[in-house]
């Protein structure tokens, strides 16, 4: 949605495969251009203010504003569209309505139709704690959640028991597992279901045969006159016992845990169902004599009665019977209480009825134990009528016994019934859960669906997660109030967030540090440790270079070399430190920000947006002040005005320099070293010394990316040295000043100055945005300044060097810097020299222009030299020794000579 498609690629192509991710400056610009943001949740669009989302900074939406890279955005949202300022979340749209209202009103409610666990998952996703639910929704939410958590806990225990059936430590584990599933899990396969049906049929057949053997018509008399089983029914019973025996042995052999198998209640029932048959056979066959048979006969009858326990084998295949057994086991407290009540009632009422009826003739209440039977059937409201009281007192006792029996039995019975109902539902739910889990596992093996682990999905919902995590590591460097990350609405910060807080470049920091790195990869890795919105321009350029190296389309540079072939240059980033200065301050005009970019594929435009030097314009702080920047240049070259009007595009520069040491300065005009690098896409041009080579002494590594870029850029970087001598102030400029503030420059000598000039290229006919109005004036001895007196901006006395790279799309030549010498009558003037020095195997033109002053008492203006000449003609006017051009960064009007009081015509210069 938010991609930039390179040339030659289809715009409909997927961003993740062929196109570059959006640049961080594009993301920053998209967020700062509007006070509102569009949030698309499951196809439902919402529009909300950024400051509303800032109320909960530690939530997912609160972190959205701080994500200024493609990777960090995709960690927070699922997709985004920078053109529409829209962010997409593939979540439940209904639940998000309640969550968004929490940002707006501070009240969190759960909708009636929402599932409790589903709403809890949404709260976890958006980073909001469930404890902030209002009281009207908390009871319903927590009740449903606890119920579901209990069911999930039971299911987890069941699954743990099933997962504990390990066959790895035994022989033939695969075959034994298949046999175990066939006998113990009827729903595992069709064969297991058939086997379970056959087992049920044998149980029913065995029960029917046992019942028919008791019929006299089907019995046979033995030699002792005792009835025996029918031979045909005996064969049927033998077959059934053989099946039960085989089934029991196979279960025992395939069981993963033999001792656990023996302790199982269903397995004990199976053993009791087959054991009496074998005991009976053993006793009858070992005692053939009449005397021995008579002694064993009663024992055999007991075991024959135990065969009726075969009917309990149906519990293996019936959930209801299993529930009944588990209910009796779980309700032993209630059953014990019921028996205790009955026993106490029987004892009391049997004693009362005995003393009431003992005087009657032919009474059946002969003793208290004989009265137990009457009390039992009376309290259970059965009343057989075989024994009853006859006296009035006995009848009253019988009535009280009936009432007490109803009350005693009615109290614990509902508890037992409720336990049975709950356990039965739980058994059915577990069966369905097991089926669902097995179906998911099969689907996972087939690759048709993603397996979901319910225990992991709802593990976090069982705990109260507080998202109020305090920031670490920021309190040491932050003055003022820390960021309130608590979710309580009473602690929200309702103050409007300043635009400077969201800018990509913080220009009002109190401390700066110097970073020096030689490897771009190392610098790129270091950027990941800091917040994306604090990336410097050089780091953003490194990031962009790393991205472009991976692309199949490389942009050739003017000398036909690829980006990868360029040698790595020593890069150093110098940042400044704020120093307190008692000097007076100069009001600096508001600067204008870069409001539009024609192309973001250029490195220069990329860094110009990233550094964002218009912080003073948007900041709520008062505008800082700066002293005058004083520059000394020789007189202007002829034809400067015509050339500048023909070459209107402004400059873009990215400065990398080392800080020089400081030495004592004399009250003289200080020399300035300027190295000019011109790299153009057009044909070569010649200067006064003939055509210049296109190779540059210190070529920027980003220049290879500009070969086919329509965006034209020029860059100038100048370091200055000053003189300690006094000089009158330069009047403040009414033109657009450089985006430099007093906070960016130290006002004492040993501090390093690094000025970055970033500007967008306008159309060919537009005037340069960076420039100053330059005037010529006569001698100004005794001149009274028109503006209030202010102190000069002082620089270190040592010579400072820098590069100036001017890239255009019209020419490919190097332009030449020339300076003129002051008349020899000026004793304190410095020579203007021109030298050529090779660097890195190439021969760039390095020019050193030195400027002098007429006298120590003369006005020391901030002069500026013509940087380059026109394309068609190059004029030199060495006779203009009495007039000097000023690099008027902050003043539009300059007097030509110290003694003049008039003004020369306005001349516009560009850096």
Swiss-Prot record:
Compositional bias per record (Polar residues), positions renumbered to this chain: 523-534, 700-712, 852-861
Ranges that cross the membrane: 191-212, 233-254, 266-284, 297-317, 333-354, 396-424
Keyword Transcription: no
Subcellular location: Cell membrane; Perikaryon; Cell projection, Dendrite
Composition-biased stretches (Basic and acidic residues): 508-522, 837-849
Molecular functions (GO terms): delayed rectifier potassium channel activity; potassium channel regulator activity; protein heterodimerization activity
Membrane topology classification: Multi-pass membrane protein
Modification comment: Phosphorylated. Phosphorylation at Ser-608 of the FFAT motif activates interaction with MOSPD2, VAPA and VAPB.
Intramembrane features from the record: 369-380, 381-388
UniProt note: domains: The transmembrane segment S4 functions as a voltage-sensor and is characterized by a series of positively charged amino acids at every third position. Channel opening and closing is effected by a conformation change that affects the position and orientation of the voltage-sensor paddle formed by S3 and S4 within the membrane. A transmembrane electric field that is positive inside would push the positively charged S4 segment outwards, thereby opening the pore, while a field that is negative inside would pull the S4 segment inwards and close the pore.
Protein name: Potassium voltage-gated channel subfamily B member 2
UniProt source species: Bos taurus
Lineage: Eukaryota, Metazoa, Chordata, Craniata, Vertebrata
């Amino acid at each position: 949605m938010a991609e930039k498609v390179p040339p030659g690629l289809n715009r409909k192509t997927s961003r993740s495969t062929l196109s570059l991710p959006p640049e961080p400056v594009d993301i920053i610009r998209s967020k700062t251009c509007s006070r509102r943001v569009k949030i698309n949740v499951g196809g439902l669009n919402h529009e909300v203010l950024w400051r509303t989302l800032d109320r909960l900074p530690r939530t997912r939406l609160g972190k959205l504003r701080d994500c200024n890279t493609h990777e960090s955005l995709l960690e927070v949202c699922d997709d985004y569209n920078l053109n529409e300022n829209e962010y997409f979340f593939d979540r439940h749209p209904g639940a998000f309505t309640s969550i968004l209202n929490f940002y707006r009103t501070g009240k969190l409610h759960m909708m009636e139709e929402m599932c409790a666990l589903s709403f809890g998952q949404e709260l976890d996703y958006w980073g909001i704690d469930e404890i902030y639910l209002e009281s009207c929704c908390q009871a319903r939410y927590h009740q449903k959640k606890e119920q579901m958590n209990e069911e999930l806990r039971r299911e987890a225990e069941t699954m743990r028991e099933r997962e504990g059936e390990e066959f790895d430590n035994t022989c033939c584990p695969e075959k034994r597992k298949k046999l175990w599933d066939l006998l113990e899990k009827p729903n595992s396969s069709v064969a297991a279901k058939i086997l379970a049906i056959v087992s049920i049929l044998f149980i029913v057949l065995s029960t029917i045969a046992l019942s028919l053997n008791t019929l006299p018509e089907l019995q046979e008399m033995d030699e002792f006159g005792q009835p025996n089983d029918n031979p045909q029914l005996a064969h049927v019973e033998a077959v059934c016992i053989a099946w039960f025996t085989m089934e029991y042995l196979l279960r025992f052999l395939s069981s993963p845990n033999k001792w656990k198998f023996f302790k199982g209640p269903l397995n004990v029932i199976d053993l009791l169902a087959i054991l009496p048959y074998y005991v009976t056979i053993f006793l009858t066959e070992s005692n053939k004599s009449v005397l021995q048979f008579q002694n064993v006969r009663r024992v055999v009858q007991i075991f024959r009665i135990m065969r009726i326990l075969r009917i309990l084998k149906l519990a293996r295949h019936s959930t209801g019977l299993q529930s009944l057994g588990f209910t009796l086991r779980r309700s032993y407290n209630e059953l014990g209480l019921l028996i205790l009540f009955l026993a106490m009632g029987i004892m009391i009422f049997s004693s009362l009825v005995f003393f009431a009826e003992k005087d009657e003739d032919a009474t059946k209440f002969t003793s208290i134990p004989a009265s137990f039977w009457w009390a039992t059937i009376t309290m259970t409201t059965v009343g057989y009528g075989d024994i009853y009281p006859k006296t009035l007192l006995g009848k009253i006792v019988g009535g009280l016994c009936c009432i007490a029996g109803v009350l005693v039995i009615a109290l614990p019975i509902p508890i037992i019934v409720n336990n049975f109902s709950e356990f039965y539902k739980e058994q059915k739910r577990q069966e369905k859960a097991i089926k669902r889990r097995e179906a998911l596992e099969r689907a996972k093996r087939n690759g048709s669906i993603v397996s979901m682990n319910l225990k992991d999905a709802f593990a976090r919902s069982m705990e109260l997660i507080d998202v109020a995590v305090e920031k670490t590591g920021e309190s040491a460097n932050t003055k003022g109030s820390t960021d309130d990350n608590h979710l309580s609405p009473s602690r929200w910060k309702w103050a409007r967030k300043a635009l400077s807080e969201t800018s990509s470049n913080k220009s009002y920091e109190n401390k700066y540090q110097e970073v020096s790195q030689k490897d771009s990869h190392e610098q790129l890795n270091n950027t990941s440790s800091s917040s994306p919105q604090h990336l410097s321009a050089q780091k953003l350029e490194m990031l962009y270079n790393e991205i472009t190296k991976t692309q199949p389309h490389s942009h050739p540079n003017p000398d036909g070399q690829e980006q990868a072939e360029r040698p790595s240059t020593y890069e150093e980033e110098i940042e400044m430190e704020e120093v307190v200065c008692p000097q007076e301050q100069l009001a600096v005009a508001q600067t204008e920000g870069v409001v539009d970019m024609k192309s973001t594929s250029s490195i220069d435009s990329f860094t110009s947006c990233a550094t964002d030097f218009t912080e003073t314009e948007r900041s709520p702080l008062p505008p800082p002040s700066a002293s005058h920047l004083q520059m000394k240049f020789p007189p202007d070259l002829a034809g400067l005005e015509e050339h500048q009007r023909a070459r209107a595009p402004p400059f873009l520069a990215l400065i990398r320099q080392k800080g020089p040491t400081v030495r004592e300065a004399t009250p003289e005009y200080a020399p300035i070293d300027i190295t000019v690098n011109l790299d153009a896409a057009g044909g070569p041009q010649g200067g006064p010394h003939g055509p210049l080579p296109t190779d540059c002494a210190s070529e920027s590594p980003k220049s290879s990316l500009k070969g086919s870029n329509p965006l034209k850029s020029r860059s100038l970087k100048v370091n200055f040295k000053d003189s300690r001598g006094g000089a009158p102030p330069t009047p403040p400029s009414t033109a657009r000043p450089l985006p430099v503030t007093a906070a960016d420059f130290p006002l004492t000598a040993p501090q390093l100055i690094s000025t970055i000039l970033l500007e967008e290229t306008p159309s060919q006919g537009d005037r340069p945005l960076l420039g100053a109005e330059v005037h010529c004036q006569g001698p100004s001895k005794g001149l009274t300044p028109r503006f209030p007196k202010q102190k000069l901006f002082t620089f270190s006395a040592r010579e400072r060097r820098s590069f100036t790279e001017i890239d255009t799309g019209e020419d490919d030549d190097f332009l030449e810097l020339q300076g003129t010498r002051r008349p020899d009558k000026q004793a304190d003037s410095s020579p203007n020299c021109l030298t050529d020095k090779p660097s890195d195997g190439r021969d760039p033109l390095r020019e050193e222009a030195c400027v002098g002053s007429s006298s120590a008492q003369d006005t020391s203006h901030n002069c500026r030299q013509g940087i380059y000449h026109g394309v068609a003609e190059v004029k030199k006017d060495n006779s203009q020794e009495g007039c000097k051009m000023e690099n008027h960064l902050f003043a539009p009007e300059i007097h030509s000579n110290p003694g003049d009081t008039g003004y020369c015509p306005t001349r516009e210069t560009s850096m």
